[in-house]
C-alpha cells in the first residue's frame, strides 16, 4: 500500500539530473492532493521507494512553462477544496432534506389537542350563531308587544327603515366597511340547528310571522324602543335578511343604554361574520366586551379569531368563555381544534421553509458542480497524457538508481547510550523502527541547530541532578506578590499567617463563605484623597445647648442629573425603614473622633454645628453625617445625607459618598442595589481598594463567588495604602488558596453577574459594568526583590525522599461526587490548582514556557522548582512563589519539559533562561523513565522572531499541536449581541416585566417606512434590499431574549417578551433601546426585514456613542445573509464608536473569517484578547486559523 509523503528539502531535488529535475520541481511547488483523484505527486511504494504518481496533474505537456505550472498548482488546490465543499454540501443536503410525507396525518393522530378536539378545525362550524337574550337584562318581551292582539291574514313585517329615518349616529359603527355595504351583504343559509330559530317562538308562543306583525305594531306605537328594535333584529336574523338585521341593529344601538348595547352588538357581529366581514365583526364584539363580559361574547369572538387565523387570540377568548361558563363543551372542542390547527400550520410552515432551503441549496450545489467540471477541464487541458508520463517515470527511476550507486546518502551515529541519533545534514533520515533504533528518542541534525522529538514526555525526576539546578540562576524574575496596599513584604513579616494562611487556619477562621450579615462594612474616608475636615473648637458652639442631631435637609440641594437615577429609588424602599445600628460604622466613627468617651449625642451636636457653620466643603461634613446616622441605625437620614453629599461633591470625588452609601445598603441586605452604586464608583475612581472590597462583599452575599474573587484580586493589585482593608486579607487569601474548602470549583459566574459574556473566563467585563475604568489607577508594584528567583514549592510531606514525583490526582470538578481522594494527594493537587489564578495574575507571562494540564485545568509554566527539604529541616509546609528567598536555591530542583522540535536562531548559542532543549539533556546522558503522566506542558512554537508569548499574543502552535487540537468549525455562524446594560442602561426601566399580561399576544413592529437619513445606512445593499434577504435567523439568541430582566423577574416565554416589547414600543417609537430589543426579537424569529426595520429606527434615534448596540445586531444579520462587505462596513463602525468592547472586535473577526481573509481575522481576534484575555472562543478560533494557515503553507513548501 502506497502512502503519501512530502519532500524534505531542495538539496535532494538538486541532486537529480535529466528531465526528472523539472518534474521534481513541480512536486516542490505543489504537494497538495489532486482534487479529482485525491492523491499527491509523490508516493512511497511497498518496498519503501519514493516515486511520483503515474497520473499526476503536475506532469505537464509543457514542463518548461513556469506560469502554467503555478496555475496548475493553484487549480489543483482549488479543486481539492471545491471537492471537499461539494461533498460536505451534498452530505448536508441529504442529512437535512425533509422527507416526511405523512406529517398532517401523523399530527392529527398523535397530537393531544387533536385527539381532544376529535375533528379538525375545518370541519367545525365557525359561523355558529350566538345571541344574548333580553331576559339576561331583566327585560320581558311580553311587556313591549301585545301578544293577545289579533293578527290579520296578511301580517306586516317590522321594516325598521320605514319606522324611523336614522340620522348619522356615532353609536351605529357606520365607519365599518361591512356596515357601509350592508345592502350587498351575503346571506349564507342558516343551519336548522341554529338556536336563533327557537328563541322568539318558544318565548312568545306564536309563529314567526305573527311575532313579526306584533313587533311592527309595537314599533308603530313606540319608535324609540331599543327592546323592539332588538326583537326586530332577531326576527330578521331568523328570516336571514342581513340588510334588515343591520338596519334594526343600528337603531337599537342608537337608543340603547351603554349597559344594554351588547345585545345588538352580538347580533350585528353574527351577521357581519357570516357575510365574511370577520375583521369588522371582531371590532364589534370587542366593543360589546367593553360594556359587559358575557361568555357569549367571548365565545363569538373566539370563533371570529379562529376564522381569521389569529389562533393565539382565539384560544385566549375560549379560555375566558370557559372561565365564565366552565364545562362549555363547544368552547372546549373549538379551543383544542384551534390549538391542533395552529401546531399543524407551524409544522407545515417549517417543512415548507426546509424544502425551500433544500431547493436553494440544490441549485447552489448544481452551480458549484458545473463550476467544478469546468475547472477540471482546465486542469486536464495542460496535463500530460498517461502514456507520456509512464515513459518519463521510467527515465526518472533510472536516474535515481544511478545516484543511489554513487552514494547519495548520509551516515548518522548513535550517541548517549543509543538514545539519540546524530546526523550531519538536515536531510530526510530513512531507517526502520526496530533493532538498534528501537530506543532512539530524538534525532539531532547538524550542529545542534535543530532537534526532533520522537517520544511522549513522561518524567519521574530524581533529586540528585545537580546540573539541572544550574539553570535556576538564569531564570526569570516574577512580580512580587507580597506588595500589598502600599506595604512591602517586610511589613508582613509578623503576619505570615494572614498573608500565607495554612489550610487549618482557614478552616478554623472561616469554615465556610461568610453570609451577608457576617461581612464587615467599610467607610471610605476623604483623607485618602488628601481632603480633611478641620476639628471643631468650643468657640463654635455652646456645650450647654440642647443636644442636636445633624439635619441634612437644611443644606442647599443642587441635584446632579447624572447620578440621581442611582439613588432615586432608595427613598421609597421599605427595606430601609427599619432601624438597624451598624457596629462597624460605630467603631469607625469613634476612631475618627479619636475619643471613645464622647457620647453619640455630642458627636451629633458636633456635626449639627459643622453643617450650619461649615469650615470645610459641605459635602465632606454631609459624608461624616451619613456615617453618624449609619452608626445610629437611621437609614432614612443616612441616605438623605449621603445623597446630598453625592450631589454636592465634585465629579472626581463622587466615589466617596457612593461607596459609603453602598455599604449602608450592604448592611441592610440590599446587595444588588449596592453593586450598582459600587460599579458607578469604580467608573469614577478605580484606585481605591475599599471599593473593590465592598464590591467583593456584595458579590459574596449574592452567591457570586467568582465575581467576588475577581474583585478581591483587583483590590490586591492596587498599591494605594489601605489600613482598613487588612481585616479582610485573611479571608481573601483563604478563598484564593483553598477553593475546594469553599466549593469554588470553577470560574463560572453563578450568582448575579452584570455582564453576560460568551465564555466562562475570569474576565473583568463579566463582573464590572465599566471595565475600561478598572485599570486607570493601577500602578506597577515595587521592583523590590527584582534579582531574586521565582520559586514554586509544592508540599511533599510523607513522600519518597529519593524521587520527587508530581502527582496528577485532583478532586473531580462539579460532578456531584462525594468520593474523597487520598488526603496528601488531594492537598497537593488542590494547592497547585489554587495557584493557577495567582500565577496568571502575578507572574509575567514571558517567564513561563509551556502548559501543565491536570483534570481540565491549565497552568502555564517554564519549570517547577520542588523543595527537597522536609519539615524536619525547618522549611514551612506552605507553598511559596514569587519572592521566595534565594537561599532556597540550593534545596531545589528544576523540572523543565521540552517536547517539540525547536529551531534556534542562527548564531545564538545561549539557551533561553529556565529552558533546556532535549539535545542538551540527552548529551548529559540523563534520561528519565515514564512515570508521571502529563499531557503537557508544551512549549509554543516561536512564531515571529522576538515575539514574546503573553495574553496578547498566544504564539503559533506546532504541527503536532495542530493535529491534536480540536478545530473550530469556522464556517459556522456565531451570533453576537451587545447588551444595553453595557451602556449602563437598566432594561427593566424601559420594559414592564412585572405586570401580568392580560391582552392577546402581540409582536413588536417598527416603522418600515421610516424616511432615509444619514444614520439609517440605506446606501448599503443589504439595508436597501432588506425585503429580499436570504436570512436564516438566529435561534441561538432565544435564551438571551428570554433572560431579559432575569435578575429581578423570572424567565418568560418568547411570546411574552415579544408582547411586552410591543406594548411599550407602540407608545414610544422613538426609543432606540426598545427598537434594539424588537430587532433582537425578530433576529430570533428569523425575520430579517422586520429586524432591519427596527435597527434603522434605532440607528436614527440613538445617540452616537450608543449606535454600536444596533450596529452589532445589523452586522450579524448581514453576516448571516452572506453580505460580508456590508457586514464589514457596519462592524467597523461599531468598533470605531466603542473600541473598548471585545464583542465588537470579535464580530468583525467573524466576518473576516467568513470572507476567508484569515490574516485580518487574526488581527481582530488578537485585539479581542487584548480587551478580554481569557475569551475562549477567540482563542480557539485563533488556533484553528493558525493551524489552517500553517498546514496550508506546509503543503506548499518542502
Swiss-Prot record:
Record function comment: Plays a role in primary ciliogenesis by modulating actin polymerization.
Alphabetical keyword list: Cell membrane, Cilium biogenesis/degradation, Coiled coil, Cytoplasm, Cytoskeleton, Membrane, Repeat, TPR repeat
Subcellular location: Cytoplasm; Cell membrane; Cytoplasm, Cytoskeleton
Family classification: Belongs to the TTC17 family.
TPR repeats: 295-328, 619-652, 689-722, 1071-1105, 1108-1141, 1142-1175
GO biological process: actin filament polymerization; cilium organization
Biased composition regions of type Basic residues, renumbered to the chain: 903-914
PANTHER family associated with the record: TETRATRICOPEPTIDE REPEAT PROTEIN 17 (PTHR16091:SF1), TTC17 PROTEIN (PTHR16091)
Signal peptide stretch: none
Tissue specificity of this protein: Expressed in germ cells as well as in somatic cells of the testis (at protein level). Ubiquitous.
Region Disordered, residue ranges: 771-825, 903-924
GO cellular component, one term: cytosol
Protein name: Tetratricopeptide repeat protein 17
Amino acid at each position: 500500500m502506497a502512502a503519501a509523503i512530502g519532500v524534505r528539502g531542495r538539496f535532494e531535488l538538486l541532486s537529480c539530473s535529466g528531465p526528472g529535475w523539472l518534474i521534481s520541481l513541480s512536486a516542490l511547488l505543489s504537494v497538495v492532493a489532486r482534487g479529482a483523484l485525491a492523491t499527491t505527486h509523490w508516493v512511497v511504494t511497498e518496498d519503501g521507494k519514493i516515486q511520483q504518481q503515474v497520473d499526476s496533474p503536475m506532469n505537464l505537456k509543457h514542463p518548461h512553462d513556469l506560469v502554467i505550472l503555478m496555475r496548475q498548482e493553484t487549480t489543483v488546490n482549488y479543486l481539492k477544496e471545491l471537492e471537499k465543499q461539494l461533498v460536505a454540501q451534498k452530505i448536508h443536503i441529504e442529512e437535512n432534506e425533509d422527507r416526511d410525507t405523512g406529517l398532517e396525518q401523523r399530527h392529527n393522530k398523535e397530537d393531544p389537542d387533536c385527539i381532544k378536539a376529535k375533528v379538525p378545525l375545518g370541519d367545525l362550524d365557525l359561523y355558529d350563531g350566538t345571541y344574548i337574550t333580553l331576559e339576561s337584562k331583566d327585560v320581558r318581551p311580553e311587556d313591549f308587544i301585545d301578544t293577545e292582539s289579533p293578527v290579520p291574514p296578511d301580517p306586516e313585517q317590522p321594516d325598521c327603515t320605514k319606522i324611523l329615518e336614522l340620522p348619522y349616529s356615532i353609536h351605529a359603527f357606520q365607519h365599518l366597511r361591512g356596515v357601509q355595504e350592508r345592502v350587498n351583504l351575503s346571506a349564507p343559509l342558516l343551519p336548522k340547528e341554529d338556536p336563533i330559530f327557537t328563541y322568539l317562538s318558544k318565548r312568545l308562543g306564536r309563529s314567526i310571522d305573527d311575532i313579526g306583525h306584533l313587533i311592527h305594531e309595537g314599533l308603530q306605537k313606540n319608535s324609540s324602543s331599543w327592546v323592539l328594535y332588538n326583537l326586530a333584529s332577531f326576527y330578521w336574523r331568523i328570516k336571514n335578511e342581513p340588510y334588515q338585521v343591520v338596519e334594526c341593529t343600528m337603531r337599537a344601538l342608537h337608543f340603547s343604554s351603554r349597559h344594554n348595547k351588547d345585545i345588538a352588538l352580538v347580533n350585528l357581529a353574527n351577521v357581519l361574520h357570516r357575510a365574511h366581514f370577520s375583521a369588522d365583526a371582531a371590532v364589534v364584539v370587542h366593543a360589546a366586551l367593553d360594556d359587559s363580559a358575557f361568555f357569549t361574547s367571548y365565545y363569538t369572538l373566539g370563533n371570529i379569531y379562529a376564522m381569521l387565523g389569529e389562533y393565539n387570540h382565539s384560544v385566549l377568548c375560549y379560555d375566558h368563555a370557559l372561565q365564565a361558563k366552565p364545562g362549555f363543551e363547544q368552547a372546549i372542542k373549538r379551543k383544542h381544534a384551534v390549538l391542533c390547527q395552529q401546531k399543524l400550520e407551524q409544522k407545515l410552515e417549517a417543512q415548507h421553509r426546509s424544502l425551500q432551503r433544500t431547493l436553494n441549496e440544490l441549485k447552489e450545489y448544481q452551480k458549484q458542480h458545473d463550476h467544478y467540471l469546468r475547472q477540471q477541464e482546465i486542469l486536464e487541458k495542460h496535463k500530460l497524457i498517461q502514456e507520456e508520463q509512464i515513459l518519463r517515470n521510467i527515465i526518472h527511476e533510472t536516474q535515481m538508481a544511478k545516484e543511489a550507486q554513487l552514494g547519495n546518502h548520509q551516515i548518522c551515529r548513535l550517541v548517549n547510550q543509543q538514545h539519540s541519533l546524530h546526523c550531519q545534514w538536515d536531510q530526510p533520515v530513512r531507517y526502520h523502527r526496530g533493532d538498534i533504533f528501537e530506543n532512539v528518542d530524538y534525532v539531532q541534525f547538524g550542529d545542534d541547530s535543530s532537534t526532533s522529538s520522537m517520544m511522549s514526555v513522561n518524567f519521574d525526576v530524581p533529586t540528585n541532578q545537580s546540573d539541572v539546578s544550574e539553570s535556576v540562576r538564569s531564570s526569570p524574575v516574577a512580580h512580587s506578590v507580597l506588595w500589598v496596599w502600599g506595604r512591602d513584604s517586610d511589613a508582613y513579616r509578623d503576619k505570615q499567617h494572614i498573608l500565607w494562611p495554612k489550610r487549618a487556619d482557614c478552616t478554623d477562621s472561616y469554615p465556610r463563605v461568610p453570609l451577608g450579615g457576617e461581612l464587615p462594612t467599610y467607610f471610605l474616608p476623604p483623607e485618602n484623597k488628601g481632603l480633611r475636615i478641620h476639628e471643631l473648637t468650643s468657640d463654635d458652639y455652646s456645650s450647654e445647648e440642647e443636644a442636636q442631631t445633624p439635619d441634612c435637609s437644611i443644606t442647599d440641594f443642587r441635584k446632579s442629573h447624572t447620578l440621581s437615577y442611582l439613588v432615586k429609588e432608595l427613598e421609597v424602599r421599605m427595606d430601609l425603614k427599619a432601624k438597624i445600628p451598624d457596629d462597624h460604622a460605630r467603631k469607625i466613627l469613634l476612631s475618627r473622633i479619636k475619643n471613645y468617651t464622647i457620647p453619640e449625642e455630642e458627636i451629633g451636636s458636633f456635626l449639627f454645628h459643622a453643617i450650619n457653620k461649615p469650615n470645610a466643603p459641605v459635602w465632606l461634613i454631609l459624608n461624616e453625617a451619613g456615617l453618624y446616622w449609619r452608626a445610629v441605625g437611621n437609614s432614612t437620614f443616612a441616605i438623605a445625607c449621603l445623597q446630598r453629599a453625592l450631589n454636592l461633591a465634585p465629579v472626581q470625588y463622587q466615589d466617596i459618598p457612593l461607596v459609603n452609601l453602598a455599604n449602608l445598603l450592604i448592611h441592610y441586605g440590599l446587595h444588588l442595589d449596592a453593586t450598582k452604586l459600587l460599579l458607578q464608583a469604580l467608573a469614577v475612581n478605580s484606585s481605591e481598594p475599599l471599593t473593590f472590597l465592598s464590591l467583593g462583599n456584595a458579590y459574596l452575599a449574592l452567591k457570586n463567588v467568582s465575581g467576588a474573587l475577581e474583585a478581591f484580586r483587583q483590590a490586591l493589585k492596587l498599591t494605594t495604602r489601605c489600613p482598613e482593608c487588612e481585616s479582610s486579607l485573611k479571608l481573601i487569601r483563604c478563598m484564593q488558596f483553598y477553593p475546594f474548602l469553599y466549593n469554588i470549583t470553577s470560574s463560572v459566574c453563578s450568582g448575579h453577574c452584570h455582564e453576560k459574556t460568551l465564555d466562562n473566563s475570569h474576565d473583568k467585563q463579566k463582573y464590572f459594568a465599566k471595565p475600561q475604568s478598572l485599570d486607570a489607577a493601577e500602578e506597577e508594584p515595587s521592583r523590590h526583590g527584582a534579582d531574586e528567583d521565582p520559586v514554586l514549592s509544592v508540599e511533599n510531606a510523607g513522600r519518597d525522599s529519593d524521587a520527587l514525583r508530581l502527582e496528577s490526582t485532583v478532586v473531580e470538578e462539579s460532578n456531584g461526587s462525594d468520593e474523597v481522594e487520598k488526603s496528601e494527594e488531594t492537598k497537593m493537587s488542590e494547592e497547585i490548582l489554587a495557584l493557577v489564578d495567582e500565577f496568571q495574575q502575578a507572574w509575567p507571562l514571558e517567564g513561563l514556557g509551556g502548559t501543565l494540564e491536570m483534570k481540565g485545568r491549565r497552568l502555564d509554566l517554564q519549570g517547577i522548582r520542588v523543595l527537597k527539604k522536609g519539615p524536619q529541616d525547618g522549611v514551612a509546609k506552605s507553598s511559596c512563589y514569587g519572592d521566595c528567598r534565594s537561599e532556597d536555591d540550593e534545596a531545589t530542583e528544576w523540572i523543565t519539559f521540552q517536547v517539540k522540535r525547536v529551531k534556534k536562531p542562527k548564531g545564538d548559542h545561549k539557551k533561553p533562561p529556565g529552558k533546556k532543549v532535549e539535545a542538551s539533556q540527552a548529551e548529559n546522558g540523563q534520561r528519565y523513565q515514564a512515570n508521571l503522566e502529563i499531557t503537557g506542558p508544551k512549549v509554543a512554537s516561536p512564531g515571529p522572531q522576538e515575539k514574546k508569548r503573553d495574553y496578547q499574543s498566544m504564539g503559533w502552535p506546532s504541527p503536532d499541536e495542530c493535529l491534536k487540537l480540536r478545530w473550530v468549525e469556522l464556517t459556522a455562524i456565531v451570533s453576537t449581541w451587545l447588551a444595553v446594560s453595557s451602556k449602563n442602561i437598566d432594561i427593566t426601566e424601559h420594559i414592564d416585566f412585572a405586570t401580568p399580561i392580560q391582552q392577546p399576544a402581540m409582536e413588536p413592529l417598527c416603522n418600515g417606512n421610516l424616511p432615509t437619513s444619514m444614520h439609517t445606512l440605506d446606501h448599503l445593499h443589504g439595508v436597501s434590499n432588506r425585503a429580499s434577504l436570504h436570512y436564516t435567523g438566529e435561534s441561538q439568541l432565544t435564551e438571551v431574549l428570554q433572560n431579559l430582566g432575569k435578575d429581578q423577574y423570572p424567565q418568560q416565554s418568547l411570546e411574552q417578551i415579544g408582547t411586552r416589547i410591543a406594548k411599550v414600543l407602540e407608545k414610544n417609537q422613538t426609543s432606540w433601546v426598545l427598537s434594539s430589543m424588537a430587532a433582537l426579537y425578530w433576529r430570533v424569529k428569523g425575520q430579517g426585514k422586520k429586524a432591519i426595520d427596527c435597527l434603522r429606527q434605532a440607528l436614527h434615534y440613538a445617540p452616537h456613542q450608543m449606535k454600536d448596540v444596533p450596529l452589532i445586531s445589523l452586522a450579524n444579520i448581514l453576516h448571516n445573509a452572506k453580505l460580508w462587505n456590508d457586514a464589514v462596513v457596519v462592524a467597523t463602525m461599531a468598533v470605531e464608536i466603542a473600541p473598548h468592547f471585545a464583542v465588537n472586535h470579535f464580530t468583525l473577526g467573524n466576518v473576516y473569517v467568513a470572507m476567508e481573509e484569515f490574516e485580518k481575522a487574526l488581527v481582530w481576534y488578537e485585539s479581542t484578547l487584548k480587551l478580554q484575555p481569557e475569551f475562549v472562543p477567540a482563542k480557539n478560533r485563533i488556533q484553528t486559523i493558525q493551524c489552517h494557515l500553517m498546514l496550508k503553507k506546509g503543503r506548499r513548501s518542502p
